[in-house]
């Protein structure tokens, strides 16, 4: 039996049969029921693989986590797990290094585990339609969006903060506290990621304040790791660069920078002020507590999985949500006279 035979017996189109076989949400319940009845009656095995006969309908949702051991993800993952536990779905998670291709990983998982949908936790912001055509299930970009890519907004879903605006607010906070020589601790200024968006927020705030960009104060770490941030900050401090404050694109990078500053005799905040974005728990317990713009991590996880389940179960289509951040004043920013 072929897909064409199933379509004829179920009185639907071939494309409808294909969507049912791939557990796509954009099929009416009546058509889905008729197609499944034919499949079960004729014991049709998709892809000529016996393993696919075990389940016509999978209850697995994939989670691809890009950037191993990033503490920012902990609360997001917990919120996703909680929602899945109460919704009758199981979670299949893969962690990949930041340099790996999350779309390719998701496509492989989809076929191996017969996923109903995928959440990408962290990823690039420059996808093309050709890239994501590998995916046959709904997906949500969690903590980022496709700012530099060519995907039509209606073709995918995302839950994120306004990265550029949040970085602008952080830099503006330093400016309002009297700082003019402000270093930026980023991964890369042009990597088509949230780092680039936050760098653009930093440069926008400086430009509005009439402060020329000093590229010697743009510190590139290459990653969000504490160790790499510590190393990058040491390099700049050894060069004798002059700055009174640091805008770090994440709490992790700020923590690494603060250790380097301390070891160079520049205590925070008296010797140098530091502000960041994230709000991970540990940053409130370092000395001094970090001043940061907190992302609503649990809400980000809850909304991402709810949007995905709504698409899987046919309740809604693709959408985009931008969540607010909240400034948590710590003890890492000093007001200059």
Pin down the residues of each PLM region:
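Generic beta-sheet signal
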Residues: 121, 142-144, 161, 185, ...
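Hinge/beta->alpha junction and helix N-cap segments in small-molecule ligand-binding domains
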Residues: 66-75, 93-101, 158-169, 185-232, ...
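Alpha-helical recognition/docking segments in bacterial nutrient-uptake
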Residues: 56-172, 176, 238, 242
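Flexible loop/turn connectors
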Residues: 232-337
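Periplasmic-binding protein-like
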Residues: 114-121, 183-186, 219, 240-250, ...
């Amino acid at each position: 039996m072929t897909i064409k035979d199933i379509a004829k017996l179920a009185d639907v189109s071939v494309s409808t049969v294909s969507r049912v076989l791939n557990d796509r949400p954009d099929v009416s319940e009546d058509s889905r029921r008729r197609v499944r009845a034919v499949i079960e009656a004729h014991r049709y095995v998709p892809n000529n693989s016996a393993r696919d006969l075990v389940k016509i309908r999978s209850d697995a949702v994939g989670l691809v986590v890009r950037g191993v051991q990033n503490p920012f993800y902990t609360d997001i993952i917990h919120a996703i797990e909680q929602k899945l536990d109460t919704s009758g779905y199981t979670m299949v998670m893969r962690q990949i290094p930041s340099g790996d291709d999350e779309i390719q990983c998701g496509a492989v998982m989809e076929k191996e585990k017969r996923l109903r949908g995928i959440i990408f936790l962290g990823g690039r912001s420059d996808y093309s339609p050709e890239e994501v055509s590998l995916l046959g299930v709904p997906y949500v970009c969690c903590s980022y969006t496709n700012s530099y890519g060519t995907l039509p907004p209606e073709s995918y879903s995302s839950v994120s903060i306004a990265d550029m605006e949040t970085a602008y607010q952080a830099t503006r906070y330093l400016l309002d506290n009297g700082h003019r020589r402000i270093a930026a601790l980023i991964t890369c200024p042009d990597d088509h990621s949230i780092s680039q968006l936050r760098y653009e927020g930093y440069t926008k705030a400086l430009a509005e304040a009439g402060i020329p960009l000093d590229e010697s104060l743009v510190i590139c770490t290459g990653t969000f790791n504490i160790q790499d941030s510590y190393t990058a900050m040491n390099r700049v401090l050894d060069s004798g660069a002059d700055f009174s404050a640091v805008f770090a694109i994440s709490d992790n990078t700020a923590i690494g920078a603060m250790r380097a500053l301390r070891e160079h005799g520049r205590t925070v905040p008296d010797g140098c002020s530091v502000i960041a974005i994230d709000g991970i728990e540990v940053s409130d317990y370092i000395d001094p507590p970090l001043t940061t713009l907190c992302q609503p991590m649990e809400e980000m996880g809850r909304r991402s999985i709810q949007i995905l389940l709504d698409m899987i179960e046919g309740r809604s289509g693709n959408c985009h949500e931008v969540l607010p951040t909240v400034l948590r004043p710590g003890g890492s920013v000093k007001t200059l006279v």
